[in-house]
């Protein structure tokens, strides 16, 4: 079946190339409604505005077709005990090497994870210190502003008190002068 499919693909390639070549030699379309090959036949059904339609008829494979050949594997030679031992040792070395490589990879991965965690802790500590410093600075600024506002308020109250005392004194002087 696979051989038939391959032959079909090849014939279709040839068909399109044949059509191309024919159109070069014969600019006017030829009236070839049937193309015949060894194991297939192509009939043109009708022409359409969107393209052409074909009917493809595959002939059954001939009874003399070649049976799929299986390649015989080369005969294995007998291995000696030394050769078997060498192969086993080589396999053991490969296994150990692969194991060492996996362990190395895991160690590198753990080291990377440790570095990432260390960096995250440092950044967190730096952020905490910066936030604490900003908070202390802000609290100091708020305290200074509060003290300045209180001093200004006390100054205004003292000024009002002096003014009130002066007004009382002036009133007493007026009462004494008028009385």
Swiss-Prot record:
GO terms for biological process: cellular response to nerve growth factor stimulus; microtubule depolymerization; negative regulation of microtubule depolymerization; negative regulation of microtubule polymerization; negative regulation of neuron projection development; neuron projection development; positive regulation of microtubule depolymerization; positive regulation of neuron projection development. The modification Phosphoserine is found at residues 16, 50, 62, 73, 80, 97. Gene3D superfamilies: 6.10.280.30. Pfam families: Stathmin (PF00836). It comes from the Eukaryota. Expression is neuron-specific and found in cerebellum, forebrain, midbrain, tectum and spinal cord. Residues 38-179 form the SLD domain. Residues 1-26 are annotated as: Membrane attachment. Keywords: Cell projection, Coiled coil, Cytoplasm, Membrane, Phosphoprotein. One of its GO terms (cellular component) is neuron projection. It is a peripheral membrane protein. Residues 39-96 are annotated as: Regulatory/phosphorylation domain. Is a key regulator of neurite extension through regulation of microtubule instabilily. Belongs to the stathmin family. This is Stathmin-2. It comes from Gallus gallus (Chicken). The lineage of its organism: Eukaryota, Metazoa, Chordata, Craniata, Vertebrata. The gene is STMN2.
